[in-house]
Swiss-Prot record:
Protein name as annotated: L-proline--[L-prolyl-carrier protein] ligase
InterPro entries: AMP-bd_C, AMP-bd_C_sf, AMP-binding_CS, AMP-dep_synth/lig_dom, ANL_N_sf
Source organism (scientific name): Serratia sp. (strain ATCC 39006) (Prodigiosinella confusarubida)
Phenotypic consequence of gene deletion: Cells lacking this gene show a white phenotype and produce 2-methyl-3-n-amyl-pyrrole (MAP).
Pfam families in the record: AMP-binding (PF00501), AMP-binding_C (PF13193)
Reaction equation(s) it catalyzes: holo-[peptidyl-carrier protein] + L-proline + ATP = L-prolyl-[peptidyl-carrier protein] + AMP + diphosphate
Entry GO terms, CC: cytoplasm
Amino acid sequence: MTISTPVIIDSLIRHAQRTPEQTALLCGDQHWNYRQLVTRAHVMASALRQAGLSGQAILLNLPKSLDAVAAIYATWLSGNHYIPIDYSQPSSRIERIIAAAAPALIIDTAWLATLDSQPSFDAEQPVGRMVYHNPIAAILYTSGSTGTPKGVQISHEMLGFFIQWAVRDTQLTARDVLSNHASFAFDLSTFDLFASAYVGAATWIIRESEQKDCAALAQGLQRHAVSVWYSVPSILAMLEKSTLLNPTLGQSLRQVIFAGEPYPVTALKRLLPCLPQPCRVSNWYGPTETNVCVAYAIDRARLAMLKQVPIGLPLEGLTAQLEDENGDRHPLTAQLRLSGELLISGPCVTPGYSNVVVPRQAALHPHQCHATGDWVEMTPEGLVFRGRIDDMVKINGYRVELGEIESVLHQHPAIDRAALCVELGDLRQTLIMVISLQTGAVPPGLLELKQFLQQKLPSYMIPNKLVITESLPVNANGKVDRKQLAGVVAV
């Protein structure tokens, strides 16, 4: 299915015309209805058009706010695309992204102040549809292997395909209230913002200061009667550990979705009793280059039999293949235990990168195919993530998938989170376990953990060192930061 019209912006404007008083956004003590949101976006778009900007990259260096959302739509209404910046990240990385992106304009708080001081931009501008020419909706910057952030182009076709699938999968309606926990620079935010705009629902924008504040999250969840929650697993685990989340507080929840990293089965089992019984729980998978491309609905009854939460099966309309160690590609079939790098084809795939050349991807993307770099295995429950190809190391001549060891470690009752790193020696590499503990748990020793792992893994996959830390370092998206992990080990 090819989507040639900007379905999201058309839907947004339609809601502003038909249900102008419907709540669109909630943030702190502020809220906007759909007319207010579209009117503000038009004011910004008028300024961009008067500046002669069309088909350009507009960088958004703003904290999460109502204005930040309006700025996103303003870039589309003026025929441009947006580049969101995670406002909480170090200034040095922001500078690297700005240098790599070379935007035509930066919208920041100073730009907004100037805009508001100019009476020529009428706040009561009529709501209407703008002519649309730019096929690119956004450029999202992710970490690059060279140290230079990598700009992933997000097309309107990609967004339209994903949002229409997500709305069907979650049975989203205008009565829903979605939570937006992710930074606007993270691809998870595209569901929160654009699925709600597509159906006319409301979105609670969780500000940077609230993102790791369990009390603020619990209060907002209840206050706004959030019905659809979407975040990385570590945030859900944090809420569960706080003991603030329970079926009564979260009684409005009907969908809880996690993505971005594996959710250990043991941790997920602890989360489920905190949710209302009818609440559907899903695992969505996909790199920025495809957004969500594989999904799995959690079966509470079957969860007890699983060692790892599957990522599931490709979305309808997409094709998945597994490329084995020999470079041979295999279609997904009923053949179990087939493993390889996951390749995804279809309208969800990025057109390419904005500022770098990734040789293998550059060859695949024109054919709407993306090599994810993730090693997966086909099981009766669907695809299971086994680890990043980048995280596969050779130990004594054996290929070792760090993710497989981490998955087993997460089954230990004392462990909250676990990650592996490799210490390079003159003659050999040493595997090191880095773990954080469950509240009140007795710290396990190295021997105990080695014996635990030996029950499920071959001897060459057993780490020889252990580091226990209060918490594992995470990046801005809530995922374990492996570069910082090496620093924890070195201390």
